[in-house]
Amino acid sequence: MKTDNGESNPHRFGPVQRLRTRTKVLPEHARGHNRALVLQTLFHAGAMSRADLARETGLTRVTISDLVGEFITDGIVVEKGIRSTTGPGKPPILIDIDRDGHRIVGIDLSGPGAFEGALLSLDGEVLERREVPRPSGGTAAYEAVRALAQELLSLTTVPVLGVGVGAPGIVRPDGLVLTAPNLEWTDFPLEKLLSAALDLPVLVRNDANAAVLAEYTFGQARADMLLIKIGRGVGAGLISDSQPLVGSRFAAGEIGHVVVGTDGGPRCACGKDGCLEAWLSATHLRERIAEAGDEHADAVLREAGTRLGVAVAPIVAALDLSEIVLSGPADLLEGTLIDAATRTLTERTLEGVYDDVVIRLTAQRDIVLRGAAVMVLSSQLGVS
């Protein structure tokens, strides 16, 4: 974490890790778990007294007092005044995460014409936004990202917790972009380069994986869900049992180039016929509607929704998902397309088991930028 005077705070909050029941629980593991539990509780429940926090978390008052003291010293938690009370005794002092005392920088590299960036509050509110034209790729693309991040950092006078970046393509957990053809990146160490250039914690993840984190943390998402991001391309992020899934090849959710059906279909940019992206991307949908004419728009959208239902039915059945969330242009996705996808999903899964699976449009704007903020919150504070 970097302060106004440019000095780095050596105290870092590590990511939340699940304790394995067969592994010896060391004191430092338990303490890290308790720190994350306290901050997670405050983040979602808001200001409360130390006694309330002890009751909510199940930790002892001594442990709570110790941890809260550390958090106040680190500038993460603040006292917010006293709770009004009519009973006897000293009124309790309320504490909360210092939501106005820190900022996060989020960057979205998935747009067709520009890289978008924002300065966000800890609650995911966009406070300032900037964008730069999207270069052709390679080194020029990296320099544009770095310049955008530095411009956003210059807009705040309070400490910045970190920088989150949502990038297209396949991204390793250490922020190495394995492949992003549209940006001409292969085995590109984006996270490492940005962290060195900015002297701040930097997290780089796939853009759809960032988006699903935003829906889970700031939206109304359930604990088992698939978010499909639909724009120039099609990609997905997965949450299972409240945990993000990335897969053994770091490519979980790369459903855009899965061929849907055996009857061919429109030619995809990858060279195959009938990929989900060729049916469903916003670019292809608008092109086909323009070719067919407005009077046939519903037929185009119905076909795309049917293909979507075919694609997600085995995923829902394999992972026992509760909902499918779509992120993309509402004028294309709401209504006919979602209705067709829902009907096809029901027809292609076990009757009576998956009938309550919901396919809906996200209500969130700036979902990748907000997801980038969640990446930083999780890494630095253990909050998700």
Model segments located where?
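ATP-binding/phosphotransfer module of carbohydrate and carboxylate kinases, centering on a glycine-rich
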Residues: M1-P133, G137-P159, F218-G219, T262-R267, ...
